[in-house]
Each structure stands twice: as structure tokens, then as C-alpha cells.
């Protein structure tokens, strides 16, 4: 027999069989969106197959046979109200007591009150229904997998457990307080634990007594209550016997016709508590509890069995056992405390209950729903199925339990006032993802390049980025903008080691890396990436990748590698790939104009004019005509090779086939400049302007340099001053046309700031052109004009300093050097660097070389001291010779400044400087200072330098001095050494030996 039941998906669906066995398991653990799940089931106790259908769009649950056409499965309105009412009731109850004391307990109840067990769970289905509803309360989600494994027991074990649960009583309590009434009033009073009284008092105070509906039961419901009361009476009697052994002062009096009572000492707080409970009890229920004739018989049987149970409990209390033995596993009750909390509840707590049918179909519904769910989960191979994009939301894979994939509650069945923490967060927006990627790029850019691999992986994974082809490409792009090409290669290596990362368009990532490496001028690394692309069919280069690597190699001048790339384009893959669906896949390509232009760029760097004719031949074979850009590059190749006649020839060919561009005119102007034809260069630019071709700034810059090198500085400056005002005037006209008069000043200032740097570069180029041509005066004139327009930078000042010194204008050079040195004293913040220039190493070396060459030792000393003051160190290879010459010329302060500088920096002076200082001290008669300088360096000089302080070396030095001076020196050295044992190879030891040999030689000669 099969029953098809449709109900709200928030509860469960059921299939009922004749044995009425039930098995419970949560049905919906995780939200499915816009999907339909159909599972075929083979019932164990049914011959016919059933189909379990979950339509998650409409939240319908149904059971159909395979022969049915559609899933026409909708819950009835009464069933829907019934389930929703139970769910809302469960949500309001946050705490439940383990044991509910009857209405008359405590001494204040009515003797003829009608008792009824309201929420006793006879079947496993209804007992689990309470847990199921509590599980979907306000702050609880189904997560207890241990309960689910226990709930997989069959129906017989479930019924046996419920029966044993009815016999189980509170094992931790030291006393029982019960009040029974059979014909009159019979009471049993037992002292109970203080914690139990406080908890029970708090629960009784918060009980609700104004429920609007009663419980209507049919004849089958009365029979069910009979079984419940029989088992209750047995348990209470057993508890009473047990308490009898623990309390020696219990006096039990029984009366068959009148009043029978069992009296025990009672605590005062216990009486106050029951008095308070009776005060809050509700006795004005709006509707009674309708029962049939069998209900009256039930009350008689219940009361008789309750008295027997109490007597049994009193006898049982004689034993010393503190716990009540039960047949059920104690671990199950400890793991399921919420199920043991709800035992009994008064009829007076609710005026109106849940309407049930005569056959108790609510219990059967839940039991069969659990059983069907268990069968569905056992037969549905969820591991082999692949989750779709929408099903994957919120799924958490667990190899031990497939149910972990559905560990979240369906949001559609949550109440509006409940928390939505379980619902997946919305997808990250594109802007937010871009911000995360850029932040990660900055973190990686600032980190150490030699950071460990685990630390790099941690930084990558902690960015909260879902790594796809697009996100990795953007990460490489941001790293390229920051100029960190090493980190780009590290990111690619990290991706190659990730087994979980499956890229569909890895070619795009490699191509982006090629672009970054090309902009960073890293041709070798780009070629390595290109070789890596050839190893996989998914990353095999396309035309975009070939263009990128060709441009990179062409700018670097690697012609051989560039021809290798061209051969790779035209040939099939050398590696044999696995056969794919692309049977006719052919990666062979022909070079296009971009690749050929890259070859011309390489020829410019290598100055190989033969490559230009090879490009023309290849274009002719393909039937293509050279573009203006190609002609311009060919002319540039001929200019680099100094074949000026070919430049003019190709320019004439370009005029016949197409209109020359600004690049071609620039190459032509540079050619005329090299030939010394400045007038023709001017006419060429005028012809370009007459044709309506807009020249670039580089063109006018080259023309201005041509004029300045020819001595026509005014015309060159006019050319420079002509370009910028024209641009500013055009921008100003555009602003007026756009009716944005109020933004004119702001835009003009912005344009001036943008044009500031190119203007400095332009003037610097003009000065360099004049210096190269030998026109120092013109260079000085342009330098003075430049100060009126913009502030010269360090490069401009160094060029002019060298020009002054080469042109014999030493005074002008000294003034410029002094101005640059004094600017360092007036810098207080970063904005001062824009208008002031500080000298660098090139500035000091240029000034020192010129002063030493012209033997201007005073200026040399000033420049040398300024160099040390600005933080630049003494360079022995460059400065030692000049320092020794200055010392011999009488500028000993230069040598002393060098000695002090090296002492502060813990550096050992070179041996020529040590000897020179020693000689100067001996000449002045300061033997103590001379010996002290050697003693301080004794033991610190390297072995390679000790050769300069050998005995023979000192002998050559001492030959310059008189005998009396050497004798005095020997005495001072002996006093310095004293009793200390100096090795024969030490500096002072060698000096002493040399002095003795020198004196012996002089004495022998005399």
C-alpha cells in the first residue's frame, strides 16, 4: 500500500506502509535554486517502485510512480496550516524541561482535574518532529550529524527506545515530589534538590496558559493515550519505590475509602514555590477537551497504575543506587538532551491544541517522510553527479558524508524576521574585484622578491580572489604597470604548480606576460615565456603573441632570435600533442606587417641595412606594398647606416605610392642635419606643413637642434617657442567653444604643468647640440633663455658646467658650482627640489678634474670638502692621485680631511696615503703623531698591503731623512713598543728593523 502525500518542503514527504515504520532524516539541508531533483526509489516493503520528486522552484514534495506523466503534487491547505502552526509554536519555545509535573503537584491543585499527556512522543516520527521543528527555530540550523546517524535506526528500535524513555526518570535528582489523586486526595512529598526546584520554579513561571485551541482526539487517539498513561504509571511507581530507600523519614499512609496520603518532610522553599505556581496557573480555559466514552475508562486505569508506580518507586528508594538503570544507551540521551527535555505538559497550559485526525495521520506523515528521505539518500549517487553553477552555491564537500553538501537551510522556508546568515553572500562586483586585485598587486610589489614560496602562496590566497583567467590577467597587468616584471614571472610559476587551477585560456595570461616583459625591456625573459607557450596546445602562440614577442626582440636588436620566431610561425609544432576534437587544427601563420616592422627595428639597432631589403623582398612575394610606417623604418635603417643617398631615394618612392607621414619627415630632417644642410631641413618642414601634415614634437625638436648646431640659435628658440603657444591656443579655443570659460585658468595651469618637463628636455637638447658643435656661447645663451621659461634640471646644469670648463669659462663654471652647492642649504621640504638643484657625483668629479688639471688647488680643496659634506665618499681610484698632489702642493688639509673621513667610516686608508701622512709628520718633526698613526693601523692592514710596509720599503723611505732624525725615530719606536712583543712582520717592527739597518749602514760608511 502506498500513500502519496504532498506537503510543505519545510517539513518532509512520507510514504506509508502497512508496518507503519518510520525513519527520519533531514530532507533539505542546502538551498537549490531553479533546479529539479528526481530520485527513483525501490521501497523495501513495497513491490511497486516509487518516484521521489523535489521541485525546488515551487517547494513541492511528491511521490509518484514511474508511469505517471507529471508531478502534479501540491499540499492541501489544512496540512499546510497544520505544519506551519507547529513550526511557529516550536520557535517560541527556547527552553524545555526534562520532566513536566502534573497540574495538581505541589498541594494546590484540584483533585478532580483531568490529566492528559499532551506532547508525549509515542512514535519515533512525532518525537523527531519536535526535534525537527526546534532545529529550524530562530537561531538553529541542522548541523548535528551524530543525531542523524542515531536517527537511521529502523522503526522497531525507534518504538523500543520510546517505550524505555517513558520508564526513564531524572537520575540526578536526590528526591521526588509528587502528588497523586485516586478517589480523594493522595500526596507524596519528597525533598528535592535545590537546583531542580529553582529551575522548575523558573519554568513554571514562564509557562503560557492562554493558548486558544484545545486538543481534539478521536477514538484512536484515546487508545494512544491509554498506552501512554499505562507506561507513565509504571514509571512513577518505580520512582516512588526508589525514593523510599533513600529517605528514612518517609511515612506513607494509604486509605482505601477515604483519603490516602504519603507525607514526608517538605522544605519551606518548596511550599512557597508551589504556592507561586498555583497562583499563576490558568483555570479559565475557553474550550474543554472533548473525549469519548473510552476517555473515562482511560482515567480510571491511569490513576490505578500511577499509584502502583509510586509505591514501586518508594520501595526502590531503599537501595543505595543513585542512578536509575534504563535499557537505553546513556550516551544517546547525553547527545540528545533536547529530546529528553520535553516529557509531559499540562492540559491546562493550552486551551486549544492541534487538531488531529482519527487515525493520527500527522504521526504517520512524519514517520514515512523520514523513511522516504533515508531511502532517497541511500540510492542517490550524489558524489558522481556534478553540481551545476547554481547548485554549487553554499555547498561544502565532505568525503565522509554526502549530506554535508546540503548543510544549509533553504532560504525560501525561513521566516521574514529570521536571520539570513546562512544565505550565500551576493556575487562580488567587478569594481570590488578590481580593487582587490590592485591591492594584491601592491602588496606583492612591496614584498621582498626573495620571499619564501609558502609566504607567497599565503599572500596570494589571502586576497579573497577567485582566480580565473581574467583575474590572473588583471593581476599581471597591475604588476606590469608597477614595473615589477620579476613578480609577474613568479605569479606564472605559481599558477603552473597549482593542480586545482584549470585554465581555459592560458594563452591570454602568457600573452599579457609577454606584453609586460616587452615594456620592461626584458627580451630574454620574454623569449623564455615564449618557449613555455610552445609546450601546450592550450597555450600555443597566436598572432597576438607573435606580434608581442617580435616587437620586444626588435626593440632589443635580437635579429637571430627574431628570425627563429618567424620560422616557428611558419612551421608546424615540433612537439606532438595528444589528439583532440580539433582534427584540422593548424597553428602555422604568416608574418604580418607588424612582425616585419619589428625586423626593421632590429636592423636599426644592429645597423644592418641588408635586413631592410629582405623585408621588401618578403612583402613583394606576398603581393603587399610597403606602408608609410615601413618606408619610414627603412629610411631610419639607412640613416643609422649613414647611407644618406638611400634615405632620399626611399623618400621619393614613398611620395609616389603614398603620403609621407611625420616619421618619414623626421628621418629626412635628421639626414639633412647630418649632411649640414640646415636650409633644406627648414624647407622640408615648410613643405610638410603646406601639405597639411601635422608634425610631431620630436620633428620640431630635431629641427631646432639642427638650427642651433648651425649657429642659428634664435631660429631654433623661435621654433621651440612656436610649438607650445600653438598648442595652448588650440586648447583655449576648445574651452571657449565648449562654453567653459570658468575653467580656462585651471586648464591652462594644468597644461603648463604637463608641458613643463618636455620643455626642459627640449632646451637641454638644444644646449647639447650647441656643445657638440662647439658653440659654447650659443649654449650659454640658450641656457640663459631657458631660465626665463623653466627651471634647469641637474642634467642641464651638468652639461653647462662641462661646457664652461671646456670653453675656458672657469669663472662661470665656479659660479654655477657654488650656486648648486648652496642650494642644498635652502632645501627644507620636498617642494624645494623643484626649483633648486643639488650636485651629484658627476658634478663633483667634473669640477675636481678640471681644478686638478689647471692646478687650482684652492678651488680643488673647496670642491673636495663640499663633496664630503654632501655625503659622497672618497674613491681611491679616482681621488687618491689628486689628494696626494694637493698634499705635495701644500694643501695638507685635503689629506687630513680624507684621513678623518675614513676614520669615521671605519675604513683603512690606502698605503700611499699612510706613507704620505707619515712623511709630512716627520718633516714637521712630529714623531709622536707619525708613530701613533702607524700604531693605530697596526694589525688592521691586509696582507696584500703589508708589502708596502716591508723592511726594504721603509729603507727606501728613510734614505730621504738625516741620521739624527732616524735615530730619534728609532728611540720613539722603541719606547712605543716597550715590553710588548711585536712580530717581526708588523708595521712598527719592520720600521724599527729598517732604522737599525739604516744606522748600521751609515756608521759603516763613516
Curated annotation (Swiss-Prot):
Residue spans of biased composition, Basic and acidic residues class: 194-219, 265-284
Biased composition (Polar residues): 254-263
Pfam family, one: PPR_3
PROSITE patterns on file: PPR (PS51375)
Start-end of each PPR repeat: 468-502, 506-536, 542-572, 592-626, 627-657, 661-695, 759-789, 793-827, 840-874, 875-909
Subcellular location: Plastid, Chloroplast
Major location (coarse): plastid
Keywords: Chloroplast, Plastid, Repeat, Transit peptide
Transit pept. (range): 1-40
GO biological process: chloroplast mRNA processing; chloroplast organization; embryo development ending in seed dormancy
Any one of the GO CC terms: chloroplast
Chain's role: May play a role in embryogenesis.
The protein's name in its UniProt record: Pentatricopeptide repeat-containing protein At1g30610, chloroplastic
Annotated gene: EMB2279
Amino acid at each position: 500500500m502506498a500513500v502519496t502525500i504532498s506537503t510543505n518542503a519545510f517539513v518532509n514527504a512520507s510514504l506509508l506502509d502497512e508496518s507503519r515504520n518510520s525513519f527520519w532524516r533531514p530532507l533539505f539541508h542546502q538551498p537549490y535554486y531553479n533546479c529539479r531533483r528526481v530520485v527513483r526509489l525501490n521501497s523495501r516493503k513495497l513491490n511497486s517502485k516509487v518516484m521521489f520528486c523535489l521541485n525546488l522552484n515551487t517547494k513541492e514534495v511528491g511521490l509518484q510512480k514511474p508511469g505517471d506523466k507529471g508531478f502534479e503534487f501540491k499540499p492541501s491547505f489544512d496540512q499546510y496550516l497544520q505544519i506551519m502552526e507547529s513550526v511557529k509554536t516550536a520557535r517560541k519555545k527556547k527552553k524545555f524541561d526534562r520532566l513536566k509535573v502534573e497540574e495538581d503537584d505541589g498541594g494546590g491543585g484540584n483533585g478532580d482535574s483531568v490529566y492528559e499527556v499532551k506532547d508525549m512522543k509515542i512514535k519515533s516520527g512525532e518525537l523527531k518532529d519536535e526535534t525537527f521543528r526546534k532545529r529550524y527555530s530562530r537561531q538553529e540550523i541542522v548541523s548535528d550529524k551524530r543525531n542523524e546517524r542515531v536517527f537511521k535506526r529502523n522503526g522497531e528500535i525507534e518504538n523500543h527506545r520510546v517505550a524505555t524513555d517513558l520508564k526513564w526518570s531524572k537520575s540526578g535528582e536526590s528526591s521526588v515530589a509528587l502528588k497523586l489523586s485516586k478517589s480523594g486526595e493522595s500526596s507524596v512529598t519528597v525533598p528535592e534538590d535545590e537546583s531542580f526546584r529553582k529551575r522548575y520554579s523558573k519554568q513554571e513561571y514562564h509557562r503560557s496558559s492562554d493558548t486558544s485551541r484545545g486538543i481534539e482526539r478521536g477514538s484512536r487517539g484515546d487508545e494512544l493515550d491509554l498506552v501512554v498513561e499505562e507506561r507513565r504509571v509504571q514509571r512513577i511507581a518505580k520512582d516512588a519505590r526508589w525514593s523510599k530507600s533513600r529517605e528514612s523519614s518517609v511515612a506513607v499512609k494509604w486509605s482505601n475509602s477515604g483519603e490516602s496520603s504519603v507525607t514526608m518532610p517538605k522544605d519551606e522553599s518548596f511550599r512557597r514555590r508551589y504556592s507561586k505556581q498555583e497562583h499563576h496557573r490558568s483555570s479559565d480555559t475557553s474550550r474543554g477537551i472533548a473525549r469519548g466514552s473510552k476517555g473515562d475508562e482511560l482515567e480510571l486505569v491511569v490513576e490505578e497504575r500511577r499509584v502502583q508506580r509510586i509505591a514501586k518507586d518508594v520501595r526502590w528508594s531503599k537501595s543505595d543506587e543513585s542512578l536509575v538503570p534504563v535499557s537505553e544507551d546513556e550516551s544517546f540521551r547525553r547527545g540528545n538532551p533536547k529530546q529528553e527535555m520535553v516529557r509531559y505538559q499540562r492540559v491546562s497550559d493550552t486551551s486549544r491544541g492541534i487538531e488531529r485526525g482519527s487515525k493520527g495521520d500527522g504521526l504517520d506523515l512524519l514517520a514515512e517522510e523520514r523513511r522516504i528521505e533515508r531511502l532517497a539518500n541511500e540510492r542517490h549517487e550524489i558524489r558522481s553527479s556534478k553540481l551545476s553553477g547554481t547548485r554549487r552555491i553554499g555547498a561544502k564537500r565532505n568525503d565522509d558524508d554526502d549530506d554535508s553538501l546540503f548543510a544549509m537551510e533553504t532560504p525560501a522556508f525561513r521566516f521574514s524576521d529570521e536571520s539570513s546568515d546562512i544565505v550565500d553572500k551576493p556575487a562580488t562586483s567587478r569594481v570590488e574585484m578590481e580593487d582587490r586585485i590592485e591591492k594584491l598587486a601592491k602588496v606583492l610589489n612591496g614584498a621582498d622578491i626573495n620571499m619564501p614560496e609558502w609566504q607567497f602562496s599565503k599572500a596570494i590566497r589571502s586576497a579573497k580572489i577567485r582566480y580565473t583567467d581574467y583575474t590572473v590577467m588583471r593581476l599581471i597587468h597591475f604588476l606590469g604597470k608597477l614595473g615589477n616584471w620579476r613578480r609577474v614571472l613568479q605569479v606564472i610559476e605559481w599558477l603552473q604548480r597549482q593542480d586545482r587551477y584549470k585554465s581555459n585560456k592560458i594563452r591570454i595570461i602568457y600573452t599579457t606576460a609577454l606584453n609586460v616583459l616587452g615594456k620592461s625591456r626584458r627580451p630574454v625573459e620574454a623569449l623564455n615565456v615564449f618557449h613555455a607557450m610552445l609546450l601546450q596546445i592550450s597555450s600555443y602562440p597566436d598572432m597576438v603573441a607573435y606580434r608581442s614577442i617580435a616587437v620586444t626582440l626588435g626593440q632589443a636588436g635580437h635579429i637571430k632570435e627574431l628570425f627563429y620566431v618567424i620560422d616557428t610561425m611558419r612551421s608546424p609544432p615540433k612537439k606532438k600533442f595528444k589528439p583532440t576534437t580539433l582534427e584540422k587544427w593548424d597553428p602555422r601563420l604568416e608574418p604580418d606587417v607588424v612582425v616585419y616592422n619589428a625586423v626593421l627595428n632590429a636592423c636599426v639597432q644592429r645597423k644592418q641595412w641588408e635586413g631592410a631589403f629582405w623585408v621588401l623582398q618578403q612583402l613583394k612575394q606576398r603581393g603587399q606594398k610597403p606602408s608609410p610606417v615601413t618606408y619610414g623604418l627603412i629610411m631610419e635603417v639607412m640613416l643609422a647606416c649613414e647611407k644618406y643617398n638611400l634615405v632620399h631615394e626611399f623618400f621619393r618612392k614613398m611620395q609616389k605610392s603614398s603620403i609621407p607621414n611625420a616619421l618619414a619627415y623626421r628621418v629626412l630632417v635628421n639626414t639633412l642635419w647630418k649632411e649640414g644642410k640646415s636650409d633644406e631641413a627648414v624647407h622640408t618642414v615648410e613643405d610638410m606643413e603646406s601639405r597639411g601634415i601635422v608634425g610631431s614634437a620630436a620633428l620640431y625638436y630635431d629641427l631646432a637642434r639642427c638650427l642651433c648646431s648651425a649657429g642659428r640659435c634664435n631660429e631654433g628658440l623661435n621654433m621651440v617657442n612656436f610649438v607650445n603657444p600653438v598648442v595652448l591656443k588650440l586648447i583655449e579655443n576648445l574651452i571657449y567653444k565648449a562654453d567653459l570659460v570658468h575653467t580656462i585658468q585651471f586648464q591652462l595651469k594644468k597644461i603648463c604643468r604637463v608641458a613643463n618637463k618636455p620643455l626642459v628636455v627640449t632646451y637641454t637638447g638644444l644646449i647639447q647640440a650647441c656643445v657638440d658643435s662647439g658653440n659654447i656661447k650659443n649654449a650659454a645663451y640658450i641656457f640663459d633663455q631657458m631660465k626665463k621659461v623653466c627651471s634647469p634640471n641637474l642634467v642641464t646644469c651638468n652639461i653647462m658646467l662641462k661646457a664652461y670648463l671646456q670653453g675656458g669659462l672657469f669663472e662661470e663654471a665656479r659660479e654655477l658650482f657654488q650656486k648648486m652647492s648652496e642650494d642644498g642649504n635652502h632645501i627644507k621640504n620636498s617642494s624645494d627640489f623643484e626649483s633648486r638643484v643639488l650636485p651629484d657625483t658627476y658634478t663633483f668629479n667634473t669640477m675636481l678634474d678640471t681644478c686638478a688639471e689647471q692646478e687650482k688647488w684652492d678651488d680643488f680643496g673647496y670642491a673636495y670638502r663640499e663633496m664630503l659634506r654632501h655625503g659622497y665618499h672618497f674613491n681611491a681610484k679616482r681621488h687618491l692621485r689628486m689628494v696626494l698632489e694637493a698634499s705635495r702642493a701644500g694643501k695638507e688639509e685635503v689629506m687630513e680631511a680624507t684621513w678623518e673621513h675614513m676614520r669615521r667610516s671605519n675604513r683603512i686608508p690606502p698605503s700611499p696615503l699612510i706613507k704620505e701622512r707619515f712623511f709630512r709628520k716627520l718633516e714637521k718633526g712630529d714623531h709622536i703623531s707619525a708613530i701613533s698613526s702607524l700604531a693605530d693601523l697596526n694589525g688592521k692592514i691586509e696582507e696584500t698591503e703589508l708589502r708596502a710596509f716591508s723592511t726594504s720599503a721603509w729603507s727606501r723611505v728613510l734614505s730621504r731623512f738625516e741620521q739624527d732624525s732616524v735615530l730619534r725615530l728609532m728611540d720613539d719606536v722603541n719606547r712605543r713598543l716597550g715590553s710588548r712583543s711585536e712580530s717581526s712582520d708588523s708595521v712598527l717592527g719592520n720600521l724599527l728593523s729598517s732604522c737599525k739597518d739604516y744606522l748600521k749602514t751609515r756608521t759603516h760608511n763613516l
